[in-house]
C-alpha cells in the first residue's frame, strides 16, 4: 500500500473512532432518562462533533458522521441509508456482517455491516415496536411492515443460527403502472390493453408466479383499471397494495395471534367479513391455504372482477395448487366456474420480470380443468447486453367465454 493509501486508511479509522465515541456519549446521555426531540438530538450531535479537537473534519465528513449517528439512534442504523436509496428494491440482512441488496433485479453484497449483534437486535426490536408487535426467543418469527409500508420479515435466534435475519421489501409511494411495466418490457401494449378490458368487464383474474417475480406489483397495476365508482375491499397478510384514485376503498389486514395464542384474525376471517360489506370487487393479496374456498365462493356468488395472486410454476400449476388447497369433492367445478383468467409471471435469466402466459380457464371437461392460452411469451434469443429478447405472442384471437366482455359492450375478444 502506498503513502496515500496508508493515509486514507488511517483517516477512516480515526473518523470511525470519532463516530463511535460520539454515539456512545449520546447513548449514555439518553440512558440517563433525558427525553429529547429529533431537532434537539441533531443539535447535540453537531455540538459533539464540534467539540472533537483531535481530528480536523471536512464539511462532508461532518455531515456523514451526523447522518450515521442520527440513523443509529432514531432510524434503523446502517439500514437507514439503504432504505432511502430508491435504486434498492430489497435489503437482506444475514447476521451482523452479511448484508445483501437487490438493485435492478440483481443481488449485490453491501459494504455496510452492524457493529455487533446487540445493534442488529436493537434494530429488529425497533421494527417490531413500530407495529406494536412482539419478537423474541419465544416468538422468533415476525412478518410486519415499516411505517412507509415496506414489508419486513424478521427471524431471531435460536431459529436463525448466525444471528438475527431481517429481510425488507421496499415500498414505493408511486407504484408501477401498466404503462411503466410496458415500457420495461414486462408486457406488450396489446396484452396490457386486453387485460385492462378484462378487468373493466369484471373477469376474475389470478396472478401466478414464483417468489419475487412481481405478482403484487402486477396486481397493483391491474387494480387501477377497476372503475372508480365501484366499492373495493382489499385483504392482505401484510399491507402492500397501493390502489390509487379509488374513492370507495376498504383495506383489511390479517393479524397474528398474541403471545397467549389468542385474537388471531386470518385471511379467511376477513374474507367472510368482507362479504357482509357490500363489495363490488374483492382483492386478496395472496391465496395460500384454506381461504381459497372462501375466495372461490365469493367469485361464484356475484363478486365478479375479483383479483388475487398465488405461488406456482405455471398457469396449469396454479390450478393444481388451488385444487390441493380446497378440501372438497366439487373443487374442480368451483375453480372452473370461478376463475376466468390466469396471468403467469416469471423471472428470466437476465433477472428481468415478464408476463409469460395469459390463459383462459375453460369449463370442466371430463373431470379436468382445461386452459386455453391467449398470450404466450416467445423467446427470440439474447441481445448483446445479455438481455433476454422476445415478446408475448397472441395464440387465440377470441375468448371462448366472452359473455362478460359482451355485457360490458367490449368487442373484438
Question: Model regions: which residues?
Answer:
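Switch/coupling sub-region of P-loop NTPases
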Residues: 192, 202-208, 221-338, 344
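P-loop NTP-binding catalytic core
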Residues: 85, 98-201
Amino acid at each position: 500500500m502506498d503513502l496515500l493509501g496508508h493515509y486514507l486508511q488511517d483517516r477512516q479509522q480515526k473518523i470511525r473512532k470519532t463516530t463511535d465515541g460520539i454515539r456512545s456519549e449520546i447513548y449514555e446521555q439518553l440512558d440517563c432518562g433525558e427525553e429529547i426531540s429529533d431537532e434537539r438530538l441533531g443539535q447535540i450531535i453537531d455540538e459533539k462533533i464540534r467539540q472533537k479537537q483531535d481530528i480536523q473534519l471536512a464539511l462532508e465528513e461532518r455531515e456523514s458522521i451526523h447522518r450515521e449517528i442520527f440513523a443509529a439512534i432514531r432510524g434503523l442504523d446502517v439500514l437507514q441509508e439503504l432504505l432511502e436509496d430508491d435504486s434498492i428494491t430489497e435489503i437482506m440482512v444475514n447476521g451482523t456482517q452479511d448484508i445483501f441488496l437487490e438493485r435492478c433485479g440483481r443481488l449485490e453484497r453491501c459494504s455496510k455491516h452492524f457493529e455487533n449483534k446487540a445493534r442488529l437486535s436493537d434494530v429488529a426490536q425497533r421494527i417490531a415496536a413500530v407495529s406494536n408487535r412482539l419478537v423474541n426467543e419465544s416468538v422468533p418469527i415476525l412478518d410486519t411492515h415499516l411505517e412507509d409500508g415496506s414489508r419486513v420479515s424478521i427471524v431471531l435466534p435460536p431459529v436463525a443460527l448466525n444471528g438475527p435475519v431481517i429481510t425488507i421489501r421496499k415500498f414505493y409511494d408511486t407504484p408501477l403502472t401498466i404503462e411503466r411495466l410496458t415500457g420495461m418490457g414486462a408486457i406488450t401494449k396489446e396484452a396490457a390493453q386486453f387485460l385492462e378490458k378484462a378487468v373493466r368487464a369484471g373477469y376474475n383474474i389470478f396472478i401466478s408466479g414464483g417468489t419475487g417475480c412481481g405478482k403484487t406489483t402486477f396486481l397493483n397495476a391491474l387494480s387501477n383499471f377497476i372503475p372508480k365508482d365501484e366499492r373495493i375491499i382489499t385483504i392482505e397478510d401484510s399491507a402492500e397494495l397501493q390502489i390509487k384514485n379509488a374513492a370507495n376503498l376498504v383495506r383489511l389486514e390479517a393479524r397474528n395471534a398474541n403471545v397467549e395464542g389468542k385474537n388471531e384474525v386470518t385471511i379467511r376471517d376477513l374474507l367472510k367479513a368482507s362479504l357482509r360489506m357490500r363489495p363490488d370487487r374483492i382483492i386478496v393479496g395472496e391465496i395460500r391455504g384454506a381461504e381459497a374456498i372462501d375466495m372461490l365462493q365469493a367469485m361464484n356468488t356475484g363478486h365478479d372482477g375479483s383479483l388475487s395472486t398465488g405461488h406456482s410454476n405455471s398457469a396449469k400449476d396454479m390450478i393444481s395448487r388451488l385444487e390441493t388447497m380446497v378440501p372438497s369433492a366439487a373443487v374442480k367445478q368451483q375453480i372452473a366456474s370461478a376463475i376466468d383468467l390466469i396471468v403467469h409471471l416469471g423471472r428470466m435469466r437476465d433477472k428481468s420480470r415478464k408476463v409469460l402466459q395469459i390463459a383462459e380457464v375453460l369449463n370442466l371437461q371430463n373431470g379436468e380443468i382445461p386452459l386455453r392460452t391467449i398470450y404466450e411469451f416467445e423467446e427470440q434469443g439474447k441481445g448483446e447486453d445479455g438481455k433476454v429478447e422476445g415478446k408475448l405472442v397472441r395464440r387465440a384471437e377470441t375468448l371462448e367465454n366472452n359473455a362478460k366482455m359482451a355485457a360490458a359492450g367490449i368487442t373484438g375478444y
